[in-house]
Swiss-Prot record:
Region feature (Disordered): 424-611
Impact upon substituting R514P: In strain: pp3/guinea pig lethal, pp4/guinea pig nonlethal and Isolate Enterlein
GO molecular function, one term: RNA binding
GO cellular component annotations of the record: helical viral capsid; host cell cytoplasm; ribonucleoprotein complex; viral nucleocapsid
Family the entry assigns: Belongs to the filoviruses nucleoprotein family.
Protein's name according to its UniProt entry: Nucleoprotein
InterPro entries, sorted: Ebola_NP
């Protein structure tokens, strides 16, 4: 026994087994009416259960074989399905005119029968069957990517067909809910996918508009999810007149081993014959041996070479450790192209003048192709960013009402007079107090559950992008934990100084982890420039690697003061802009009309004039002086160069403008900027300070 064959054991079936599955077909003298009722049941959202596959196959038999069972039984479609383990059971009822009449009268079908009794169908057109099948075929090209991409692709195709006057679909078919139902059916039904693909490839006569759409969709589905196969065959295993030659970049021994393994996987895939290009859609055997991760170096080199040749389909993401290899392959292939073109020009040019003209033309052609490729890739990146932003906004909107209800209910539990939380209902003589951090995370909600991911793509990187065939949100470059509202702090009434002294240590321990988690949501931002890494490779990088460290340790800030407003406004005439803001809508109030007052529940503040002295620059290295701690407000400069007025800017309902500007312009991440604005009202003062000093 060859010992090296141990590496291949378990990759090929030694005792092939096919699971048998029974499919029910329906045979009546009113087949068109039955088929229309099946379509109506699907469009109404009725779960046909075990009858779904049989109903879909009945539609296909009616459309392609005019319900001729003998012709269908002798067709290659039926033979392939039988070999795949499907058994056909025909229910005959010659007089049946409704789908309800041919449904099996068994106990587990009783919910379906009740639903079908309420179903009314007025359509009895045979063309509607082809219309429905052609509509289903629109979901095939992006079926392996996801529902969002598949629905968007289908809508684009619908628009094209309507503009060309080929087919017009009913408006209620184009709703998101209905299209998600069709996507789910197509994703789970092997029979429907197989019949559409088989007929789309082999139907050569009798085409109508519906068959034309199906053939077009099937053509776009070829090699869907098999980009590595397409790129390797086109650019790595180069076919020449003398045979197949390897690309020069993969002639090293280690990559050659991957090429040999890949050839073996391709030979196994080729056994599926004409269905091999659709192996990912049909989930055929051997498809798992063609993953990018099994051939990391070959995949990275192939994608880099394909991008150099102007292929925008090669925009999938590779492993982070192989990203540099991909870029190196891209650069090397560009140089090789120029060298080959130069050699060809030298061979075909008759004189120096012609050689110069040809060289200039090829140089311009290469630059134009490269710029156009980058432009298309940039559009895909922007599309991905917009798509991710829409998804995050939908998540926030869905959770917003529940979280606001939770905040209101908890505020009534924590404080019998919750109206005192907001500015508009505070008593005239009661000071505004900043509450200690309160952990009001939703019950049973873990950090993983409460955090989702948002997409960020580096605009300076021509490779970090989404491919038309592989643009899944799961594979995109994600930044973890950017949209959740983990902290829903509900302010408590001000405690006496004795209570604060007793619980100060406990509160500090509870708030430390929350502050660190809060900042972790904004610290994993990519560097502004790839060349300038000094800001991210020295002390600041170490502090990020060690969550226990504090980037604000050089700036010792005083505790938050208490302020009383000199100019009170009528709370009825001027309500707070945001009643859910635990700090009140201080909004446009500036430091000139604020006066620190003494309170037993906070550190005493020095008496000052009504007009505060000018804010002055506070360097990050200033020492822990009592004088410095008591001079409020102060202009603070963080290690990252952000400047804000402490504590006034942290008491506003919106984050300091310098933080928003940094996220949008410096980090080029407007998504995180919006999330910071959304999370700011829910943060405690310590959390706000931590984010401001470290961002």
């Amino acid at each position: 026994m060859d010992l090296h064959s141990l590496l291949e054991l378990g990759t090929k079936p030694t005792a092939p087994h096919v699971r048998n599955k029974k499919v029910i077909l329906f045979d009546t003298n009113h087949q068109v009416s039955i088929c229309n009722q099946i379509i109506d049941a699907i469009n109404s959202g009725i779960d046909l259960g075990d009858l779904l596959e049989g109903g879909l196959l009945t539609l296909c038999v009616e459309h392609y074989y005019n319900s001729d069972k003998d012709k269908f039984n002798t067709s290659p479609v039926a033979k392939y399905l039988r070999d795949a383990g499907y058994e056909f059971d025909v229910i005959k009822n010659a007089d049946a005119t409704r789908f309800l009449d041919v449904s099996p009268n068994e106990p587990h079908y009783s919910p379906l029968i009740l639903a079908l009794k309420t179903l009314e169908s007025t359509e009895s057109q045979r063309g509607r069957i082809g219309l429905f099948l052609s509509f289903c075929s629109l979901f095939l090209p992006k079926l392996v990517v996801g529902d969002r991409a598949s629905i968007e692709k289908a809508l684009r195709q619908v628009t094209v067909h309507q503009e060309q006057g080929i087919v017009t679909y009913p408006n209620h078919w184009l709703t998101t809910g209905h299209m998600k139902v069709i996507f789910g059916i197509l994703r789970s039904s092997f029979i429907l996918k197989f019949v559409l693909i088989h007929q789309g490839v082999n139907l050569v006569t009798g085409h109508d508009a519906y068959d034309s759409i199906i053939s077009n969709s099937v053509g776009q589905t070829r090699f869907s999810g098999l980009l590595i196969v397409k790129t390797v065959l086109e650019f790595i295993l180069q076919k020449t007149d003398s045979g197949v030659t390897l690309h020069p970049l993969v002639r090293t021994s280690k990559v050659k081993n991957e090429v040999a393994s890949f050839k073996q996987a391709l030979s196994n895939l080729a056994r599926h014959g004409e269905y091999a290009p659709f192996a990912r859609v049909l989930n055929l055997s051997g498809i798992n041996n063609l993953e990018h991760g099994l051939y990391p170096q070959l995949s990275a080199i192939a994608l880099g070479v394909a991008t150099a040749h102007g292929s925008t389909l090669a925009g999938v993401n590779v492993g982070e450790q192989y990203q540099q290899l991909r870029e190196a392959a891209h650069d090397a292939e560009v140089k090789l192209q120029r060298r080959h073109e130069h050699q060809e020009i030298q061979a075909i040019a008759e004189d120096d003048e012609e050689r110069k003209i040809l060289e200039q033309f090829h140089l311009q052609k290469t630059e134009i192709t490269h710029s156009q490729t980058l432009a298309v890739l940039s559009q895909k990146r922007e599309k991905l960013a917009r798509l991710a932003a829409e998804i995050e906004n939908n998540i926030v909107e869905d959770q917003g009402f529940k979280q606001s209800q939770n905040r209101v209910s908890q505020s009534f539990l924590n404080d019998p007079t919750p109206v005192e939380v907001t500015v508009q209902a505070r008593p005239m003589n009661r000071p505004t107090a900043l509450p200690p951090p309160v952990d009001d995370k939703i019950e049973h909600e873990s950090t993983e559950d409460s955090s989702s991911s948002s997409s960020f793509v580096d605009l300076n990187d021509p490779f970090a992008l989404l491919n038309e065939d592989e643009d899944t949100l799961d594979d995109s470059v994600m930044i973890p934990g950017t949209t959740s509202r983990e902290f829903q702090g509900i302010p408590e009434p001000p405690r006496q100084s004795q209570d604060l002294n007793n619980s100060q240590g406990k509160q500090e321990d509870e708030s430390t982890n929350r502050i660190k988690k809060q900042f972790l949501r904004y610290q994993e931002l990519p560097p502004v420039q790839e060349d300038d890494e000094s800001e991210y490779t020295t002390d600041s990088q170490e502090s990020i690697d060690q969550p226990g460290s504090d980037n604000e340790q050089g700036v010792d800030l005083p505790p938050p003061p208490l302020y009383a407003q000199e100019k009170r406004q009528d709370p009825i005439q001027h309500p707070a802009a945001n009643p859910q803001d635990p700090f009140g809508s201080i909004g446009d109030v500036n430091g000139d009309i604020l006066e620190p007052i003494r309170s037993p529940s906070s550190p005493s503040a020095p008496q000052e004039d009504t007009r505060m002295r000018e804010a002055y620059e506070l360097s990050p290295d200033f020492t822990n002086d009592e004088d410095n701690q008591q001079n409020w407000p102060q202009r603070v400069v963080t290690k990252k160069g952000r400047t804000f007025l402490y504590p006034n800017d942290l008491l506003q309902t919106n984050p300091p403008e310098s933080l928003i500007t940094a996220l949008v312009e410096e980090y080029q991440n407007p998504v995180s900027a919006k999330e910071l604005q959304a999370d700011w009202p829910d943060m405690s003062f310590d959390e706000r300070r931590h984010v401001a000093m470290n961002l």
